[in-house]
């Protein structure tokens, strides 16, 4: 799971350095941040970066994830996420809607985002194109009271708790056809500025995403290979992830193992299975830039999918329960 505030998370290796970073950041009048979280399970959490994916399947889709970066370091980044989306019929057309909540703790910063998503799902070239919009409320907090350095009475340093809010907009396109999908999206389109107290501002930079994936069927009908990729940039920091998973499916169980590679950043191992109808996934990200393998990132994912029978009269009948 990747995340950054002006300087990449990968650079925050020691508590002392983290504290110094926060003082430097808060000692200027404007902070520019690209702090979006990208999860290792991005292939199951597409609405987290592309609202066009809302309602793409005729199912109620509920996801939750918890990620802990740089295990073993004090004040290490930790993120909690939960979302739900589903399709619905209105005026003889298919739409998608969703809700999303994210809480991201990075040192003395706390980022909270509550979002509503909408997508218009249209048939195109034998597949489905989702055109999505997202409206978010950003709530930012910095707790300067926890600074452990003696900064005296210098007014340039924020040594109290400061809060701020802002409205944010995102948009995305998501196209899927049989075993293939591709998506483009942009978050923080208006580059919202959050006032933190009277002296400081948090500038949230726009970020851009591209994703694609394809499922390969093997001779053994119980096996298939799912490949996916995600790239994003804010104009300063760029990251790409390439993932492959081997899926085993039988009448009574489903499980997978896989690996993800991010050039110059990390290698991630992925494991997942269905447990009593709930899909559970685990990922461990090992950094390749000098951080000890034991100080990698842990991520836990839980997913639930329920089939919906959406008829033209607008009645949604729950026929059966199926899972990833």
Predicted regions and their residues:
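Subset of outer-membrane beta-barrel
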Residues: 34-324
């Amino acid at each position: 799971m990747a995340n950054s505030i002006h300087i990449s998370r990968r650079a925050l290796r020691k508590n002392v350095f983290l504290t110094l970073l926060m003082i430097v950041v808060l000692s200027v009048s404007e902070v520019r941040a690209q702090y979006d979280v990208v999860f290792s399970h991005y292939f199951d959490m597409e609405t987290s970066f592309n609202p066009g994916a809302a309602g793409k399947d005729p199912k109620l889709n509920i996801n939750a994830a918890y990620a802990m970066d740089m295990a073993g370091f004090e004040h290490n980044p930790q993120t909690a996420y939960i979302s739900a989306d589903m399709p619905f019929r209105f005026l003889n057309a298919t739409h998608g809607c969703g809700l999303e909540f994210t809480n991201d703790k990075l040192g003395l910063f706390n980022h909270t985002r509550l979002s509503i998503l909408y997508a218009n799902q249209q048939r195109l070239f034998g597949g489905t194109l989702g055109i999505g919009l997202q409206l978010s409320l950003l709530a930012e907090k910095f707790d300067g009271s926890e600074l452990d350095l003696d900064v005296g009475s210098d007014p340039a340093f924020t040594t109290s708790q400061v809060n701020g809010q802002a409205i944010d907009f995102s948009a995305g396109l998501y196209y899927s056809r049989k075993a293939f999908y591709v998506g483009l999206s942009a978050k923080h389109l208006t580059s919202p500025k959050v006032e933190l107290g009277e002296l400081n501002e948090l500038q949230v930079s726009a970020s851009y995403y591209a994703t694609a994936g394809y499922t390969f069927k093997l001779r053994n009908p119980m096996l298939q290979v799912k490949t996916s990729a995600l790239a994003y940039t804010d104009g300063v920091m760029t990251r790409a992830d390439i993932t492959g998973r081997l899926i085993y499916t039988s009448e009574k169980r489903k499980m997978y193992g896989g690996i993800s590679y991010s050039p110059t950043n990390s290698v991630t191992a992925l494991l997942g299975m269905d447990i009593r109808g709930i899909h559970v996934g685990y990922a461990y990200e090992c950094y390749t830039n000098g951080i000890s393998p034991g100080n990698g990132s842990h991520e836990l994912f839980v997913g639930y999918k329920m089939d919906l029978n959406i008829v033209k009269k607008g009645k949604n009948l729950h026929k059966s329960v199926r899972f990833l």
